[in-house]
Amino acid sequence: MFVSIGNSRMDKKFNCTDMTYEDFVSRLSKTKYTAETMEQYRKMPKGQQDNIKDVGGFVLGKLKGGRRKKDCVISRSAITLDMDYGTQGIIDELEMFFDMKMVVYSTHKHTPEKPRMRIIIFLTRDVTPDEYGAVSRMLASDIGIELFDDSTYEPSRLMYWPSTSSDGEYVFQEIEGNEVDPDEVLSRYKDWHDVSAWPVSNRQSSIVQRDIKKQADPLSKDGLIGAFNRTYTVTQAIDKFIPDVYRHSRAIPGRYDYIPADSAAGVVVYDDLFVYSHHATDPCCGKLMNAFDVVRLHKFGDKDARAAEGTELSLIHISEPTRPISIS
């Protein structure tokens, strides 16, 4: 199976290699113990935690040019799910109730009282990025979708190799079963291309509306941004400036399709002030955007990537997009 490997989450290019199941599982079976204790790790700011657990990572699949970007995933060779809300005895339940070939290992924040696991489910064939979203969400729903991190279904999602605090517990378990046939999973949908039919957690069902309430009224923004938003509604801006990116969906009136994707109706417009894309391969997936944001990100988003880290957005002549939120 193809695995794209990076030495750090900061790597610009990941190396794709064809690994055997045995070699891949062998690497997961051993953890790297880090110097800090569990209590010290718990009290650290998130950035410091991220640096400690970054012992290199992988994406199970092929990446275009080795780039780990949303629109650079060619295919995925297995499903990887982060179980951030695990329950005690969850591994026994997976073994007892599911006939799927899986590997489970604990993440850096795992404790026996609050299990945090990474589950890898092996497939009979590679899947496209859009198929990945539909298959991973259906399988998570079977297990219990409330158990999983809401951003875990992104095809470009990096998974770290195992690491554990010096006094922490590392858990690793191979679970015997059959490789999952993606076509059988997809057939359980009336139409898997319809993103609106994909399972979501209760957290996701309210997060967009909650985030809208936190955002400033786009019509009241100062300067060029406010003027643009007052001149063009979201739908007017999309139809005029990026009709080659989004098109009106036939599946659900009032929604848009992301044209390069196989899935449909994943772009939702809210009161013609905000737009949110659920399409996993959309570079704007997971961002709540006003009219100015959606145009500038699709037309000039590469300026973000070229700017040095920490550069003020005003210095590269673009606005700050509304805060990304974890939903796919």
What is each residue range found by the language model?
Residues 73, 240-301:
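N-terminal single-stranded DNA-binding subdomain of primase/primase-helicase replication proteins
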Residues 316-327:
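Single conserved hydrophobic/aromatic residue that forms the stacking wall/gate
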Residues 1-115, 122-134, 138, 202, ...:
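Signature for HUH/AEP ssDNA processing cores
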